[in-house]
Every structure is written in structure tokens, then in C-alpha cells.
Amino acid sequence: MNRRMRSTLAALAAAALALPAAGRAEVQEVRISRGHGILYLPLIVMQEQRLVERHAKAAGLGDIKVSWPMFDGGNIINDAMLSGALDIAGIGAPGFITLWAKAKGNPKLEVGGLAGLSATSLWLNSTNPAVKTLRDFGPRDRIAMPGIKTSLSAVVLQMMVAREFGAAQYDKLDPLTVGLPHPDALTALISGNAEVNAHLGSPPFSYLELDSPRVHRVLSSVDVLGNITLDVVYCTRRFRDENPRLVRAFLAALEEADAFIARDRSGAADVFVRSSKVKVSRDEVMKMLADPDTRFSITPDGVLKYAEFMSSVKTIKVKPASWKELFFPEIHHLSGS
């Protein structure tokens, strides 16, 4: 290769890198992660009905490939995102905020929220008959949740503990927490053969646990924190900037999934039953979806509460000024909080 050709190729490469995102080809494969449970129902609907593929094709992106890896726990999801194994992720709001604060200011790693995903009530269930309130948990109790310290369940527990014992003791029950995916926590709690005797979880697991006469509910997150958004979807700033049409297609697919759930609760229940890793009946899922605390919306509602709490106890070093600082401009027209 002569010097002139090398110079020409170098110039072309530099020009390609300098092109705005809209001028580059967008990805032809997107990896979207989801976890277990009702909170991920919109993503489950999107997967079964191939909504991302349809909206991407309508946007002129052709036939894209969509894969749906399963992850549970904020730390695991964030590690996968940072390693380049994911493009878009459904995650508990605190896990997203943790990575947002950690990566802010680093152009290669910065992340932002694409949309809110879901809200429901997390129930703290226990098999210890002596445990009636948070104050009754002792050193021999073990509380299962998908991830310790920064997962949705972990931070919600800390927020509830701070309300009960004072902000200075927000992590008082952290030594009792054990990292277990929700399906495993359900099995452990009902079997009674494991060290785990409590679980802070979401539907369907929280409902199914109460079918056992050994299990009782200690507390509901809604009673303490209100009915705020629990899960969101996010991606890296780089992915969003380089794939604007795909991001818009994803959001359109998410809104269509939300509309389907609202319009056809029975059909949505069938979708969930087919996808569930635990045995649950259609009627049971219908009951969960009928709960007024269970909502699916792209509007983030109360997400800033997590950030304010996490900043106050110094688990994040950067505090967002508003919810719009956490989320990309595509949803700034919404009445979020």
C-alpha cells in the first residue's frame, strides 16, 4: 500500500469518526436485558410480540436482530452494561442511579435513562412468627433480595429502615441481607430448608409466598415510600447518540406494550404465564395486574426520591438536580419526577 493510499484511508476513517450520529449506520443487533417478575411485563410483551423489530423496520432500519438476555440484580446488570455485553437494560431505579453517578463525566461510560418501566408494591415477607415489624428482625434472620447494597430491594429496604430508625441507621439491616434471584428466594422461603427466612420481593413471587401458611407479610414498600416507579430502562449515552432511530423505535415499542397491558389485561396475563420461570396461574396474574399499585408507564414517577436518599447517605457522590438530568431528552416532555 503506497503512502498516498494510506493517507486517503486515514482521512476517510477520520471523516467517518467525525460524522454526526445520524450520518452513521445504526446497529443491526440490539441486546435488551430483563429480569424476573411482573415489573418486566412490558419488556416481556415486547419480546413475544416482536415490537422492537416492527418499529425498527417502520423506522427504516430493516430487519434487526433483538436478543433478550436475562439478568437479575443491579450490580450484575451494570457490570454487563459496562463490559459491552448489553445495549439496553431494564433495572431497578437505584441500580441505574448508582451507575449514572459513577459514570457521570466519563464520555465512554456515561449512561442515561430511556424511560420509566413499572411500579408496584414490594412486600417484605417472613416465615419468622416473631417478626411483625422492622424492629423485630434479629441477628439470626436472613432477608433475600437479588443483590445487596445497591439493588432495588436493597435500597428500598434501606429507605424503609431510615424511616423507622433514623437516617444514621439506614444500613442497620444490611448485614442480614443475602443475594438471591427472586425465584430462588421464593423456593428458599417456602421450603423452610434454607437459612433465608425473609424476602423483599415483587409479584408474582411476593404473592406466591403468601400462599404458604408459613409466610406472612411484614411490610409493603408503598405504605412507606408511596407508589413510585421501581424499574426503569437505560443505556449508555454513546449507544443513544449513535442509534437515534433505534432508540425512538424502542420507546415506541415500549409505549405500545404499555397500551396493550392496559387494554387487554387478560392477554397480558397470558403472555406473562408463558414466560414465567415459576408456576403461576392466569387468574393469579390477573389479580396482580388488577392491584392499583401495579402500573406500567414510560413516565418516571418519584425516581428522584432514590437519588436524594442515596446522596444523603453518601452511597452516590453526584446528586442530580432534577429527574431530567437522569433521563435522556426523548422523554423530557413528560411530567416526571
At which residue positions do the language-model features occur?
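Bacterial N-terminal signal peptides that target proteins for export
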Residues: 1-11
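Hydrophobic helical h-region of N-terminal Sec-dependent signal peptides
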Residues: 10-18
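Sec/Tat signal peptide C-region and signal peptidase I cleavage site
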Residues: 19-25
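Short, glycine-/small- and polar/acidic-enriched structural segments
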Residues: 26-170, 175-179, 193, 197-203, ...
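Soluble non-cytosolic domains of exported or imported proteins
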Residues: 71-75, 90, 147, 151-155, ...
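Pocket-lining segment of extracytoplasmic ligand-binding domains
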Residues: 166, 171, 178, 183-274
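Secondary-structure end/capping motifs
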Residues: 241-317
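Conserved C-terminal helix/tail region of periplasmic/extracytoplasmic solute-binding proteins
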Residues: 310-337
